[in-house]
Amino acid sequence: MMRRVAAILACVLAWVFALAQDYTFSNHNIVPFSLNPAQVGAANTIRIGANYRMQWPTLVNNYHTFRLSYDMNVYKQMCSVGAFYSYDQMSDVYKVNEAGVAYAHTIKCADNHFVRLGLQGSVFFNFVDLNSLTFGDQYSGTGAITPKSVENFESGSRTFFDFAVGASYVFQNHLTVGFAVYHVAQPDNGFVRGTQVLHRKYVGHVNFIQDLKLSHGLRSKGFSDNYFFANLTYQQQADFKQAYIGAGVCFQPIILGVSFKTDVQEVHTVSFMLGGYYKGFQLYYIFDLFTSHKKNGSWSNEISFIYTLPHKKKDLCPVVYW
């Protein structure tokens, strides 16, 4: 059993080092401005978010991702600023820390029509525990493991700066269409300099909300506490692709959602969301169920907490949707 776990972890580590793939959440719409820096300040108020994901929990050394964020509007809600910190840990071997700031500017094109432009800058602090790794040349024909390897790494840590840009079109806060590019300069991410770059990630997303109680469509100017929401997202980073579609309903104070996620090849996941909110507090739980034969540890969990400062006037849109 331990050999099987070790083999799985070795393959996973090789996959991460080879592709330099970003972490991902099942529901980025409750992970503030994680898909597009243009979505900074989209809640139209002060917003604090904390998100946690545990992946492959059936393995001995699983995968943990944590993100903390803050964003708000300034200057008549046309300018928005935000800051975030994320921590991504694979087993006890590979750890990624990212801290960054983001800015978005809203341009009014016509009544109810807006364009948002966003820019994000961040710094990465990556660490790998070289002492916990065993390389191929350390295995002898007798089954013994020699203490040293000929593999040469300059350092077990890596620090570099990164940038992202994004844009979105918003119609009355009911329909949002956006596109973003992360790792614009494709920074060097390797522990041996010049051998690995962090590939650009391209993101496209569409979000729609339909009021249920008041029968308001795209041209309504407000929302009741009951509404339907839907989301389409596509991400691509080098050879890695991910597409998902999600939908759900909100009946105050309960929010329910379901989504389907796929890498467009072999790995498919169905996610279920249960959420609730009271005044400015929101709490969500997401369960991922792998439906393909490549189960990668079978299932995953996500927990998200969001607090939004109550508005002095009625918000024009629900703060969060799937």
Label each region the model flagged.
Residues 1, 20-21:
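Absolute protein N-terminus
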Residues 1-5, 109-111:
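Positively charged n-region of N-terminal signal peptides that target proteins for export
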Residues 5-6, 24:
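Generic extreme N-terminus detector
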Residues 13-20:
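Sec/Tat signal peptide C-region and signal peptidase I cleavage site
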Residues 7-8, 18:
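Cleavable N-terminal signal peptides
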Residues 21-322:
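Subset of outer-membrane beta-barrel
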Residues 12-13, 185:
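Short, glycine/serine-rich, charged loops/turns that create anion-binding
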